[in-house]
């Protein structure tokens, strides 16, 4: 998920990768003294709970980096939202945010793998999540997921198709479906917030594409066709 303002910025300083302990597998950036040549552009998420006014479309590689950065921030943000929901005794909402976080974690790894396969390094600028009330966190999450599923990922998919980037195209198309599902879950939680105090429902998350569902009888993933055994139960 992105749910944040995307800013493509070329750095004039050397770029050093460091591991962000809050997000497994995510590489954060640090700025050092000027290098002999400009560093490659990286994508920065600014105020992660806001939806950008303008969608920036780059090359497929740049779009993969933007998606990686956004999903990395979404992973951390949803974990923080889950903690807040638990504090406010919305235990079902906390479970939902943990399921969404797991889905985003899968997206992070998926994009990193492709970026590295294409000869680059996945870089994310991890921002501290802006945590408000659970109701406000759900509202922000709905906006972010709808923006990703209706605008960002379809635009990225269109660009990937133009560049004959088949693997990226599949990732972007599948992600649009998954993020739209997240938006629906969050909308439902908002509409029924008063009933979300007790955690009664478990979620399944596909470890291949991040598909999230409450259907415990599912036979295979409707997005990537992975078998039921691939799904992880979020309790």
Model-flagged regions — what are they?
Residues 1-15:
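Sec-dependent N-terminal signal peptides
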Residues 20, 25-235:
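Non-heme di-metal
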């Amino acid at each position: 998920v992105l749910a944040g303002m995307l800013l493509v910025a070329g750095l004039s300083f050397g770029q050093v990768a460091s591991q962000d302990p809050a997000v497994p597998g995510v590489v954060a950036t640090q700025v050092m003294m000027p290098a002999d040549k400009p560093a490659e552009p990286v994508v920065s998420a600014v105020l992660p709970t806001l939806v950008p006014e303008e969608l920036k479309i780059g090359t497929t590689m740049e779009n993969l980096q933007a998606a990686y950065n956004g999903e990395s921030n979404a992973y951390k943000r949803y974990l923080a939202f889950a903690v807040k929901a638990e504090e406010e005794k919305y235990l079902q909402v906390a479970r939902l945010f943990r399921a969404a976080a797991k889905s985003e974690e899968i997206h992070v790894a998926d994009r990193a793998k492709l970026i590295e396969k294409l000869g680059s390094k996945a870089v994310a600028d991890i921002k501290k999540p802006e945590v408000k009330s659970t109701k406000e966190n759900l509202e922000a999450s709905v906006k972010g997921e709808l923006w990703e599923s209706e605008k960002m990922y379809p635009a990225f998919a269109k660009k990937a198709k133009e560049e004959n980037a088949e693997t990226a195209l599949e990732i972007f198309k599948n992600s649009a479906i998954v993020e739209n599902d997240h938006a629906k879950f969050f909308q439902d939680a908002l509409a029924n917030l008063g009933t979300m105090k007790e955690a009664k429902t478990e979620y399944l998350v596909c470890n291949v594409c991040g598909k999230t569902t409450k259907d415990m009888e599912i036979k295979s993933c409707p997005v990537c066709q992975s078998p039921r055994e691939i799904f992880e139960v979020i309790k």
